[in-house]
Amino acid sequence: MAHKISSDDRSGGTTNLEWILDNWIELGADPAKLNLGLAAYGRSFKLNDPNSHGYRAPCTETWNGSGKHSGAAGRFTREAGYLAYYEICEKLQNGWTEVWLDEGKVPYAHGDGDWVGYDNIKSINYKVDMAKTYGLGGLMWWTTAIDDFNVSLVQLDDVILNLFQGYILWAGEISIDDCSKKQLA
């Protein structure tokens, strides 16, 4: 989920993380009882036009059983529209392009006619800082089950340990390997 982006106004500005947190708190929720979820996967879509790949680019919508996600299935996850973070890293190493959407503080990637939205280390750091700023009760990571714990580009358990250690100790940036440093077998 992105942070506030000007094009969110098309949906009444209610689809970004800040609005959601502000709304819960305004309605009386205790921030210390709210947890922020972080994703170790991305949702992908088939672009209508591979040359038009920006934020909210037109995509083919196909119901795959868990939502309208029409991107190609991952090599390991094998579900259309669902890519584990290590599969996204593999695609980036094989020619996909990562784009940082500064306004939303999130990345997306595109290649082979597909588009995927996901979190990377930079966006996760930003969300951890946001959780600290709002005084949230904690963080939740979904899911370690999609890490292969053997050949992945980024061992997600390392990310999780650094993430939670940093949150608990109010430490600085998460420090781990990025996608460019390891290869899938």
Where are the regions that the model predicts?
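Aromatic-rich peripheral "rim/lid" segments of glycoside hydrolase catalytic domains that contact
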Residues: 88-91, 130, 145-185
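Stable alpha-helical elements in mature extracytoplasmic
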Residues: 13-20, 120, 124-127, 153, ...
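Active-site rim elements
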Residues: 5-12, 21-22, 111-121, 140-145
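Conserved, mostly hydrophobic/aromatic
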Residues: 36, 131, 139
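Substrate-binding surface in catalytic domains of secreted glycosidases
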Residues: 1-83
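Conserved beta-strand elements of beta-rich interaction domains across eukaryotes
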Residues: 41, 123, 146-147
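Hydrophobic, secondary-structure "cap" segments at the distal end of domains
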Residues: 69-135
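Structured segments of extracytoplasmic/periplasmic soluble domains
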Residues: 20-27, 127-134, 183
